[in-house]
């Protein structure tokens, strides 16, 4: 199990889906080291489980301003890494 602490900064998403996002991101961080690969893994998993089209941004330093579908947005930290996941389109 990972020692990364999940801190949800902002969410418009069901509790169940939020937990799924954290679990999925934890798996991605255990599997990959490159941020682009981590983001791709999370995006593809959410496309499969919750239907397209999901977008995922992973990094330590970024700003964002996005439009998302209602109840399909989460921004959280897993350890030092920020993850923005949202559905749009």
From Swiss-Prot:
UniProt subcellular location: Cytoplasm, Cytoskeleton
Q: What Gene3D superfamilies does its record include?
A: Protein Inhibitor Of Neuronal Nitric Oxide Synthase
Its GO biological process annotations read: actin filament bundle assembly; chaeta development; chaeta morphogenesis; establishment of mitotic spindle orientation; imaginal disc-derived wing morphogenesis; microtubule anchoring at centrosome; oogenesis; positive regulation of neuron remodeling
Identify the main location. Answer: cytoplasm
State whether keyword Cytoplasm applies: yes
Q: What happens when the gene is disrupted?
A: Flies exhibit defects in bristle and wing development.
Report the SUPFAM superfamilies cross-referenced here: DLC
**Source organism superkingdom:** Eukaryota
Q: Which GO terms describe its cellular component?
A: centriole; cytoplasm; cytoplasmic dynein complex; cytosol; dynein complex; microtubule; nucleus; protein-containing complex
PROSITE patterns given in the database record: DYNEIN_LIGHT_1
InterPro entries given for it? DLC_sf, Dynein_light_1/2_CS, Dynein_light_chain_typ-1/2
Expressed, tissue-wise, as follows: Ubiquitous.
Q: Which UniProt keywords apply?
A: Cytoplasm, Cytoskeleton, Dynein, Microtubule, Motor protein, Transport
Kindly list the GO molecular function terms attached to this UniProt entry.
disordered domain specific binding; dynein intermediate chain binding; dynein light intermediate chain binding; protein homodimerization activity; transcription corepressor activity
Q: What does this protein do?
A: Acts as a non-catalytic accessory component of a dynein complex.
Q: Which family does it belong to?
A: Belongs to the dynein light chain family.
Quaternary state and partners of this protein? Interacts with spn-F. Forms ternary complexes with spn-F and IKKepsilon.
What PANTHER family does the database record attribute to this sequence? Answer: DYNEIN LIGHT CHAIN
Protein name, as recorded? Dynein light chain 1, cytoplasmic
